[in-house]
Swiss-Prot record:
The keyword Cell inner membrane applies. Its main location: membrane. SUPFAM superfamilies: HIT-like. Belongs to the Cdh family. GO terms for biological process: CDP-diacylglycerol catabolic process; phospholipid biosynthetic process. This is CDP-diacylglycerol pyrophosphatase. Keywords: Cell inner membrane, Cell membrane, Hydrolase, Lipid biosynthesis, Lipid metabolism, Membrane, Phospholipid biosynthesis, Phospholipid metabolism, Transmembrane, Transmembrane helix. Pathway: Phospholipid metabolism; CDP-diacylglycerol degradation; phosphatidate from CDP-diacylglycerol: step 1/1. The keyword Lipid metabolism applies. GO terms for cellular component: plasma membrane. It comes from Yersinia pestis. Its EC number is 3.6.1.26.
Length: 258
């Protein structure tokens, strides 16, 4: 058998092994992709409706359409989750006129962090994040409410004077990934809201919302900064905007107890 044939067989075998390994990883990672929805639909909502007790959630607001759940990862991380099935950022429901403003609701829910911490937390130390369709493990929309990474806060502060009320690339990106940023006011956070600002103002975003991760943090001025990154096979970026967060909350003066 010629060396070229052996080499081709070797490459083919290697390719098959890579595909099988990728499939196994995908299966293990996403086999429990409905875990959050099961907690909300089978525990939090029933307990709230029958016993007026949101457990294991911290809050269930059925009229407003959301629940807040303490995440197991990190002492202060919470998740805001819709009380109706919504897969994620790619869902067209988020861009309808009647959709709740989940980002605004998540920002209001940040008080759970301070309550758990036992002291006020500066808004500039807090961040919200939703991962792209390719950078998440759950198929129920959830917004991470957690601390901002110290190095991210420092990097953003270096450019704070340049942030405008329109999308612009962030020079140098963050954590090795490309990001676009937009300054938004408190009014814009409420209306039209982050999902609409991304879909309506970022060229081409409305047709491929699932490829975007989206995050928000407060600026010292009282405005907010919206950050978006886009999944890319070329740069191996899954657009997990959660990467901007630090669930151990090193940014706080005193580290919280798990």
């Amino acid at each position: 058998m010629s060396r070229s044939i052996k080499w081709r067989r070797y490459l083919l075998t290697l390719l098959i092994l890579i595909i099988l390994a990728a499939g196994l990883i995908y299966k293990l990672r996403f086999s429990n992709a409905d875990a959050l929805w099961k907690i909300i639909s089978q525990q939090c909502i029933p307990h709230m409706t029958t016993e007026d007790d949101p457990r294991p959630c911290a809050e269930v607001n059925i009229p407003a359409g959301f629940a807040v759940l303490k995440d197991r990862n990190g002492p202060l991380q919470y998740l805001l989750i819709p009380t109706v099935p919504i897969s994620g950022i790619e869902s067209p429901q988020l861009l309808t006129a009647t959709s709740p403003n989940y980002f605004a609701d998540a920002w209001q829910a940040r008080y759970f962090m301070a309550e758990k911490y036992g002291a006020p937390i500066d808004d500039t130390d807090i961040s919200l994040a939703i991962n792209s369709q390719y950078g998440r493990t759950q198929d129920q929309l959830h917004i991470h409410i957690s601390c901002l990474k110290p190095q991210v806060k420092t990097a953003l502060a270096a450019h704070s004077a340049d942030f405008q009320q329109q999308w612009q690339p962030l020079p140098g990106g963050l954590l090795g990934h490309d990001y676009w940023v937009r300054r938004i006011t408190a009014t814009e956070l409420q209306q039209p809201g982050p999902f609409h600002l991304l879909a309506d103002e970022m060229p081409g975003a409305k047709e491929q919302m699932g490829r975007y991760g989206l995050a928000i943090t407060a600026l010292p001025s009282g405005d907010f900064l919206l950050l978006a990154n886009k999944a890319s096979l070329i740069t191996q970026d899954r657009a997990s905007a959660e990467e901007l967060q630090d669930h151990t909350c090193q940014v706080l003066p005193h580290l919280p107890v798990q």
